[in-house]
From Swiss-Prot:
Gene of this entry: rpsE
GO molecular function: rRNA binding; structural constituent of ribosome
GO biological process: translation
Quaternary structure note: Part of the 30S ribosomal subunit. Contacts proteins S4 and S8.
Name the record gives this protein: Small ribosomal subunit protein uS5
GO CC terms, sorted: small ribosomal subunit
Length: 185
């Protein structure tokens, strides 16, 4: 049973080439009777640059081991994010975690990734090419990454919106064109 699971994971790894980015590494200390024991905590973001991304946290006595654990954790926590034209968001979204808040805005082609630190790593591994992001409140990398994931999970694709409303995607997009035409007049 365990062997089948390992083989399935190996197949998935061969099919999907993942890009991983180290977001943050932190030295932590455990106080014991004889003094302090130092270790490391790593935050890693992993994605296939085709709309799947995940983040993981790993702790160990050595940095490479902490990074390996974080990468494995991130691969187990992948989410799929719908992208418009494979490059940007479908609509503007907000997300928060703890005291960290983020606003993600869809951007026209050629804009690039305008985002700070931890958010940039998420977008690059996700495969997003055009996005404008702003963070407020906490600048803690863990909170920023979790807030970014919260925002990405809040995004709806036109297909899911149309299904929820009980209409076709073409009807949804034709309404958008009419609204855009009225706004320019």
């Amino acid at each position: 049973m365990a062997r089948e699971r390992e083989q399935r994971h190996e197949r998935e790894d061969r099919d999907n080439t993942f890009v991983d980015k180290l977001v943050h590494i932190n030295r932590v200390a455990k106080v014991v009777k004889g003094g302090r024991r130092f270790g490391f905590a790593a935050l890693v973001v992993v994605g296939d640059q085709k709309g799947r991304v995940g983040f993981g946290h790993g702790k160990a006595r050595e940095v490479p081991e902490a990074i390996r654990k974080a990468t494995e954790s991130a691969k187990r926590a992948l989410i799929r994010v719908p992208l418009r034209e494979g490059r940007t968001l479908h609509h503007d979204v907000h997300g928060h975690h703890g005291a960290g808040k983020v606003i993600l805005r869809a951007a026209p082609a050629g804009t690039g990734i305008i985002a700070g630190g931890p958010m940039r790593a998420v977008f690059e591994t996700l495969g997003m090419h055009d996005v404008v992001a702003k963070s407020f409140g906490s600048s803690n990398p863990y909170n920023m990454v979790r807030a970014t994931f919260d925002a990405l999970k809040n995004q709806d694709s036109p297909r899911s919106v149309a299904a929820r409303r009980g209409i076709k995607v073409s009807q949804l997009q034709s309404r958008r064109r009419v609204e855009d035409a009225e706004a320019t007049d």
